[in-house]
Amino acid sequence: MTITPQNLIALLPLLIVGLTVVVVMLSIAWRRNHFLNATLSVIGLNAALVSLWFVGQAGAMDVTPLMRVDGFAMLYTGLVLLASLATCTFAYPWLEGYNDNKDEFYLLVLIAALGGILLANANHLASLFLGIELISLPLFGLVGYAFRQKRSLEASIKYTILSAAASSFLLFGMALVYAQSGDLSFVALGKNLGDGMLNEPLLLAGFGMMIVGLGFKLSLVPFHLWTPDVYQGAPAPVSTFLATASKIAIFGVVMRLFLYAPVGDSEAIRVVLAIIAFASIIFGNLMALSQTNIKRLLGYSSISHLGYLLVALIALQTGEMSMEAVGGYLAGYLFSSLGAFGVVSLMSSPYRGPDADSLFSYRGLFWHRPILAAVMTVMMLSLAGIPMTLGFIGKFYVLAVGVQAHLWWLVGAVVVGSAIGLYYYLRVAVSLYLHAPEQPGRDAPSNWQYSAGGIVVLISALLVLVLGVWPQPLISIVRLAMPLM
């Protein structure tokens, strides 16, 4: 097939990030300069973000049999690029105190972002697998970047081994689906998997194994065991990327698969997904209750958030509102997580051994860093789904979609899970306003709000509050992504 100029415009974000990877690689080979390579990475990601406007002008199209560029792809590409930008911004002050090679960090983030963009545009099981591997492989290095710390190295080894096992399940499941359907394209799967075919044992086994592989990547129960350890062991900026870009890109491609291929039409698959969603919501929230480490707490919290999103995915066949719910929820989750992990990154920078991830480190933060404490409070309230924050809009949509689809026991799980979550989110928020210890451990720099990371955290807090009160701009953007499907 011939690639036209129109096709190249549609692929601009992918091409720009790919070019940035090459430029940063050559820059590292020429001369190691932390500031230069960080700047090149941020410029490349910003250029990719701006290029989405030109992609929108080009309109929806199938660029190759493996990739479809449309409003849906643009929305998820934008979210992945924003998360990658925030990760690079938080990493810069953290790496300033890091004595080993700094520059490769940005290279790995860019390659992972490339995988995220590929997933957002994937229209075929082959590009789905390539995208997942492209986002996972750099994360093995990023999680273990602080390799002189035993916990970071342990997290990296754990994530690598379990991720390899999950990829094996995913690939074998795809092979079984291909054996039964004769095609790997999402659209062709939708056409080939007619009435009754979804109950074929081979096909059910294939989709079952794919659920295992994707469930691991999304840290859904019972494939979640790596999550708290990896979140705790990874450097704070890497945990930011793991919690946001990685989850958003993979959930986006699963959403597209469910839209084109009638996977959710199978009663057996719907029941399995409903059980996974229920277990993720309840277990994730219950396990977070007893955590005194803020990164572990946010790790368990992410399990429950993916459970909430799964409710909207199960209800996908009932109407377009599910797509709106997922888009709105993921945007709220992105900004809330960027703010929360951003505060942890600011408190942990520059690198001085383990991160400031103990809840005790944040005790009395309000009395010497009042604005930072206020930002963290807003993020906790948003993650809890309190009204007047963006997190509430997403949770409201998920509940509305669940009610519309008559998924009553999952709606009940969302309500109970949110009530449990309120306790541990408020526990973090309250500790910020207690009396500070006489000898505080870690602290953010006094001028944190003037740093790039501080500005990102403040913008995230502002968006969470403004879009929580007036969500119409966000809803309009999410709706733009739907007619182009």
Curated annotation (Swiss-Prot):
Signal peptide: none annotated. NCBIfam families: NDH_I_N, PRK05777.1-1. Its EC number is 7.1.1.-. GO terms for biological process: ATP synthesis coupled electron transport. It catalyses: a quinone + NADH + 5 H(+)(in) = a quinol + NAD(+) + 4 H(+)(out). NDH-1 is composed of 13 different subunits. Subunits NuoA, H, J, K, L, M, N constitute the membrane sector of the complex. NDH-1 shuttles electrons from NADH, via FMN and iron-sulfur (Fe-S) centers, to quinones in the respiratory chain. The immediate electron acceptor for the enzyme in this species is believed to be ubiquinone. Couples the redox reaction to proton translocation (for every two electrons transferred, four hydrogen ions are translocated across the cytoplasmic membrane), and thus conserves the redox energy in a proton gradient. Belongs to the complex I subunit 2 family. Keywords: Cell inner membrane, Cell membrane, Membrane, NAD, Quinone, Translocase, Transmembrane, Transmembrane helix, Transport, Ubiquinone. The gene is nuoN. One of its GO terms (molecular function) is NADH dehydrogenase (ubiquinone) activity. This is NADH-quinone oxidoreductase subunit N. GO terms for cellular component: plasma membrane. PANTHER family: NADH DEHYDROGENASE (PTHR22773). The keyword Transmembrane helix applies. Its main location: membrane. It is an enzyme of class 7 (translocase). It is found in: Cell inner membrane. It is a multi-pass membrane protein. Pfam families: Proton_antipo_M. The chain crosses the membrane at residues 8-28, 35-55, 71-91, 105-125, 127-147, 159-179, 203-223, 235-255, 271-291, 297-317, 326-346, 373-393, 408-430, 455-475. It comes from Shigella boydii serotype 18 (strain CDC 3083-94 / BS512).
